[in-house]
Design a protein with these regions (language model features):
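Membrane-interfacial amphipathic/re-entrant helices at transmembrane-helix boundaries
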Residues: 2-71, 108-125, 354
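Transmembrane helix-bundle core of multi-pass membrane transporters
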Residues: 16, 124, 148, 152-214, ...
């Protein structure tokens, strides 16, 4: 009886610790993952010695292969905490990768050298252009969401379709290669192993942890996600914060694009980045994007708009508008080239909300409604 009571007490303590201490819960999950993955990896080798020798290498491979998603998930955490979502990260990564590779191939001797700046790698201009382009794309999403009041789901879904389509149209099947010096960004060995992508991931995690905990911007992100109206009354520029969140997201996607292109040396414009958004969203939620407040999890699962307390039109649960999806899907049926159809579908999704609101407004003006 005493053993059962002690066991229950221990479980209760662990449960309370799990709910109150995010570091403890994260560490427990990671420990469980290590144990399960270690056992699974053990089945691939004939002897314990072979398993032990390759244990570290296997974990390095796992972390290296997930570094890109991990970096994107860091930005997605900010997005989800603020009450938003970003479905365009995969397509954005492909578009940025295309820009990087085009710049590298257009200026193989270095644009900086041409204007008198020496000692800088030829691919530096490509990286800078990629990061700027990523921030620009993130800024566009931020403006659509913060200024145009488009739901984040619709805005980023439209951006996803447009970016994927335009990138495929522009690049076609062009096989663009990058110089070996650029490959060194991710493939340089340290201690006999390729761990640079993991280090980039860790550095980004540390920087963004500091930003979220110890800067006004980090506090404003939590304030906006908790209650937009209260944040606005407290002097927070909600639109600016939302815009900067998506700019940050674009910059992190650009970093991921640099890592991916420099690892592989090429990019599949049709399939690269597919599923990145879902993996990043899942990682952000599991890792803590939705755990700081119960309300954040509720919003993510219940279908309520992130600003449902702030605007009359969002006071009731948001309903998926299937009517807007039907003609958008039909666009693909009347175009043989699916790449062009995706761009048209994305444009339709971005404008559907405004068209619906204009229609309701005109009906109110002529007295059909109310």
């Amino acid at each position: 009886m005493t053993q059962v009571t002690n066991r229950q007490t221990l479980l209760e303590k662990v449960g309370r610790k799990w709910k109150s201490d995010p570091i403890f819960s994260t560490g427990l999950v990671l420990a469980l993952m290590v144990i399960l993955q270690t056992v699974a990896l053990g089945f691939d080798y004939e002897s314990f010695g072979a398993w032990f020798t390759n244990w570290g290498k296997n974990w390095i491979n796992i972390l290296r292969n997930n570094a890109g998603v991990g970096i994107v998930a860091l930005g997605m955490t900010f997005v989800i905490i603020s009450g938003g979502i970003d479905l365009a990260v995969g397509s954005t990564m492909v578009a940025i990768g295309a820009v990087i590779m085009v710049f590298i191939n257009q200026y193989p001797d270095g644009l900086l050298t041409a204007i008198g700046i020496t000692g800088v790698p030829a691919y530096a201009i490509g990286i800078v252009a990629g990061v700027i382009f990523g921030c620009l794309l993130g800024g566009i999403s931020g403006v659509l969401i913060a200024r145009s009041k488009l739901p984040a789901f619709i805005a980023t879904l439209g951006m996803m379709k447009i970016l994927r389509s335009v990138t495929q149209q522009v690049m076609q099947t062009a096989a663009v290669k990058v110089p070996s010096s650029f490959l060194a960004i991710s493939n340089t060995k340290i201690g006999g192993e390729v761990i640079l992508p993991i280090l980039y991931w860790l550095v980004a995690a540390v920087i963004l942890h500091i930003v979220s905990r110890y800067t006004p911007f980090g506090r404003h992100v939590y304030a906006v996600g908790s209650n937009e109206r209260t944040a606005r009354l407290s002097g927070v520029n909600v639109e600016r914060v939302k815009g900067l969140i998506y700019v940050l997201m674009g910059a992190l996607v650009a970093v991921t694009a640099v890592i991916q292109v420099s690892r592989i040396g090429s990019m599949d414009y049709a399939n690269a980045g597919s599923g990145y958004e879902m993996d990043a969203i899942a990682a952000a939620i599991i890792g803590g994007g939705g755990r700081h407040q119960h309300e954040r999890r509720t919003r993510l699962h219940s279908g309520h708009g992130a600003g449902h307390a702030d605007h009359r039109r969002d006071e009731q649960p948001a309903q998926p508008d299937g009517r807007a999806a039907l003609p958008a899907r039909g666009v693909q049926g009347i175009h043989r080239d699916r790449r062009g159809a995706f761009a048209k579908e994305g444009s339709y999704r971005l404008t559907a909300r405004q068209r619906k609101e204009r229609k309701e407004k005109s009906m109110l003006n002529i007295g059909i409604i109310g």
